[in-house]
Amino acid sequence: MYQEEIIKASKKIFNEFSDTCLQISDNKFFFQPAEKWSIAQNVDHITRSVKTTRLAYSLPKIVIRTLFGKANHPSITYEELVSKYKLKLEQGGKASGRYLPKTILSKKLFLIQKWQKENEKYLEAIELKWNDDLLDHYIAPHPLLGKLTLRELCYFTIYHTEHHLNIIKVRLTDQFN
């Protein structure tokens, strides 16, 4: 995917995620199933993920290169990144540390607006500071996948959002029907 396509795909999944969450009643949104995250906690997790990811696109390029180095491999495709992530999940990979959602005390609209603001900042940073060549040149660490090119990190963000959207849709179907 080129930068323009990444931005388009990101906006599409971000909007679908927001629209889905906005349609959920507060009771369902905050319902805490045993051993699982509530929908609100999924939103919090995704917001934390995008906020942290955004840093890689917001910092000066020299800082990114100094901290993490340069890519020593071409970017893999979106499909390859998704397969790699699914394999890590199958092997027991899961969120930890700063990516774990907190107990949610905020209002639904506040959480969704916070998510939307982080998305806007993330997309703005990519659009204004990164072209296709640069997305393949720089790398950043991912807690499960290791060092990714910034293009691969964009792919991850798209798929990660879709992954949690699917979790939410399944939860709505399975638990509330």
Residue ranges and their predicted role:
Residues 1-36:
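An N-terminal domain-cap segment
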Residues 3, 9-11, 17-18, 120, ...:
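Mixed-charge, polar/low-complexity N-terminal
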Residues 6-9, 13, 17, 49, ...:
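Alpha-helical packing segments of well-folded alpha/beta enzyme cores
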Residues 19-21, 53-71, 97-114:
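Charged, low-complexity, helix/coiled-coil-prone segments
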Residues 26-27, 95-103, 139-144:
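A short small-residue
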Residues 28-83, 124-177:
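Short, contiguous alpha-helical
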Residues 75-133:
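Acidic/histidine-rich alpha-helical segments that form the ligand environment
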